[in-house]
């Protein structure tokens, strides 16, 4: 049985894709390996079924929607930060803003400025004490040039001092810029799938409250679309097109 989770897919309509992303904590039940040793020593490892985690998220989900765009399209995105006030106590001031955020459209060749008052492009120059604070909203308007390269890109927070804790929680999504006239897509009847190979790291309480939680704790696992060791089923002769993203902080594939 194929049990690989599929991120929600959204497609542009008449050249426009509109999306509201609510940033907040979400309770998620996830199967994780029973120990750090088990993860490396054997396959498949024993699992802790349905472990309850509290993770920062977009719209209450692990991984954000996959956005399907075409060259010339416009993406309109509202990011609503509904997180509580940031935890304090770090000796480094830049690490006391873990619940402020922003948005980076990774790899897109688009305007990086504040395009006009209150309308932002791929704007990631916020200092740690700026960005989208808890309770605030930011509107992004991303216009793809008509000659924009097709391929897979991704979007994620990029606020210095807070990025790792948020991306480690699953705050990321794919952007696929596709050409409807692509002869490869037109010539093969195939299933297209997005695969996030991601290292989830949480503390003993199942949270990623601080930078240290997202870097130094062994309680976690490598996941594929939020699932631990899922099964992918293919028929003989079947063709699938896999779009693979590694949103982990330190781990190459």
Feature-to-residue mapping (PLM):
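Histidine-centered copper-binding motifs that mark active-site loops
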Residues: 1-253
């Amino acid at each position: 049985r194929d049990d690989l989770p599929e991120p929600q897919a959204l497609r542009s309509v008449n050249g426009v894709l509109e999306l509201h992303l609510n940033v907040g904590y979400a309770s998620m039940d996830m199967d994780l390996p029973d120990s750090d040793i088990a993860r490396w020593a054997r396959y498949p490892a024993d699992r802790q079924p349905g472990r309850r985690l509290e993770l920062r998220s977009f719209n209450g989900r692990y991984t954000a929607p996959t956005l399907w765009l075409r060259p010339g399209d416009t993406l309109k995105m509202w990011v609503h930060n509904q997180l509580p006030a940031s935890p304090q106590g770090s000796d480094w001031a830049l690490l006391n803003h873990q619940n402020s955020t922003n948005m980076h459209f990774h790899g897109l060749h688009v305007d990086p400025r504040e395009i006009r008052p209150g309308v932002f492009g791929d704007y990631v120059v916020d200092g740690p004490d700026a960005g989208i604070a808890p309770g605030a909203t930011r509107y992004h308007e991303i216009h793809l040039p008509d000659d924009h390269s097709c391929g897979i890109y991704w979007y994620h927070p990029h606020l210095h001092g807070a990025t790792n804790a948020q991306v480690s929680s699953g705050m990321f999504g794919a952007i696929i810029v596709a050409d409807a006239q692509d002869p490869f897509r037109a010539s093969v009847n195939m299933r297209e799938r997005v695969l996030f190979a991601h290292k989830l790291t949480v503390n003993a309480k199942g949270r990623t409250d601080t930078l240290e939680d997202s870097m130094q704790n062994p309680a976690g696992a490598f996941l594929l679309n939020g699932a631990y060791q899922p099964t992918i089923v293919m028929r003989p002769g079947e063709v699938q097109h896999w779009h693979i993203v590694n949103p982990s902080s330190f781990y190459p594939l």
